[in-house]
Regions:
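An anionic, glycine-rich sequence signature occurring as long contiguous blocks
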Residues: 98-141
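Phosphate- and divalent-cation-binding pockets in alpha/beta enzyme and binding domains
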Residues: 81-82, 103
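Short, surface-exposed basic-aromatic patches at helix termini and helix-loop junctions that form
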Residues: 83-91
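Short hydrophobic alpha-helical runs that function as membrane-insertion/retention elements
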Residues: 92-97
Length: 141
């Protein structure tokens, strides 16, 4: 086994709890940390109304042990303070980046365009949840 294979992947994601809405409050929204290799939820926090996942993720990271793990987050979690918290907790990270970060997305695309033909790209396509998702990854050494 390589060192990477021994490390766990901790997927952090937000979910709205269906059926939890009533006349007194909106549906509950939670952020959970899930270890894919074990099919185990490490922790979960409720996202308070009038806030979002960005404020709940650091709170969740303080509650769970992510040391030496690889934390994955969608584009909502692509925030400096969240990355700082992950590093403080001694974990690595893989983040999604979309156009919701001003010029950051185009700056990253420009940076990686230099490597486009030097390293192979792996692409997957999945159909589900009423959409087709294509993901590409290129590993630089």
């Amino acid at each position: 086994e390589t060192e990477h294979q021994k490390r766990c992947t901790i997927a952090i994601d937000g979910k709205t709890i269906r059926g939890s809405e009533n006349e007194k409050h909106k549906a509950f929204h939670v952020v959970s940390a899930f270890v894919a290799e074990n099919q185990l939820t490490l922790g979960e926090v409720t996202v308070p109304e009038k806030t979002n996942e960005i404020t709940a993720i650091p709170e969740l990271l303080d509650l769970i042990d992510v040391e030496d793990g690889i934390v994955t987050l969608d584009a909502m979690g692509c925030q400096k303070k969240i990355v700082e918290k992950i590093c403080q907790r001694k974990a690595d990270y893989v983040l999604s980046l979309k156009g919701n970060q001003g010029d950051f997305h185009s700056d990253v695309e420009l940076f990686f365009s230099e490597f486009a033909n030097k390293y192979p790209k792996h692409t997957t396509t999945e159909k589900g949840h009423g959409r087709v998702e294509t993901r590409g990854i290129r590993t630089l050494q």
